[in-house]
């Protein structure tokens, strides 16, 4: 599936789950962002737990928020 134009994909690690399917994720470069689960992951009931490695898609307009698009097995 093609990624959105201008979106930045970066690997990270889930630090803590938050209410409403939000997660605090520490990126590979050390920054911490607030991320929610993408619709397809929610649709297929993919569970995300603390310490999971994930791929986060960031918007170039707001680098403090992102969308989790993949969870490594």
From Swiss-Prot:
InterPro entries membership: NA-bd_OB-fold, RNA-binding_domain_S1_IF1, TIF_IF1
One Gene Ontology term, aspect cellular component: cytosol
Main location: cytoplasm
Domain annotation S1-like: ranges: 1-73
Keyword field contains Acetylation: no
Molecular function GO labels: ribosome binding; rRNA binding; translation initiation factor activity
Compartments reported by the entry: Cytoplasm
Keywords from the named record: Cytoplasm, Initiation factor, Protein biosynthesis, RNA-binding, rRNA-binding
Task performed by this protein: One of the essential components for the initiation of protein synthesis. Stabilizes the binding of IF-2 and IF-3 on the 30S subunit to which N-formylmethionyl-tRNA(fMet) subsequently binds. Helps modulate mRNA selection, yielding the 30S pre-initiation complex (PIC). Upon addition of the 50S ribosomal subunit IF-1, IF-2 and IF-3 are released leaving the mature 70S translation initiation complex.
HAMAP family membership: IF_1
Subunit structure: Component of the 30S ribosomal translation pre-initiation complex which assembles on the 30S ribosome in the order IF-2 and IF-3, IF-1 and N-formylmethionyl-tRNA(fMet); mRNA recruitment can occur at any time during PIC assembly.
Family from the record: Belongs to the IF-1 family.
Protein name, as recorded: Translation initiation factor IF-1
Organism, scientific name: Salinispora arenicola (strain CNS-205)
Name of the gene encoding the protein in the UniProt record: infA
């Amino acid at each position: 599936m093609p990624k959105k134009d201008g979106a930045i994909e970066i690997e990270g690690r889930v630090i803590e789950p938050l209410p409403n399917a939000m997660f605090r994720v520490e990126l590979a470069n050390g920054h911490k962002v607030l991320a929610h689960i993408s619709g397809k992951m929610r649709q297929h009931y993919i569970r995300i737990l603390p310490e999971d490695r994930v791929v986060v898609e960031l918007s170039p307009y707001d680098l403090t928020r992102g969308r989790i698009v993949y969870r490594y097995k």
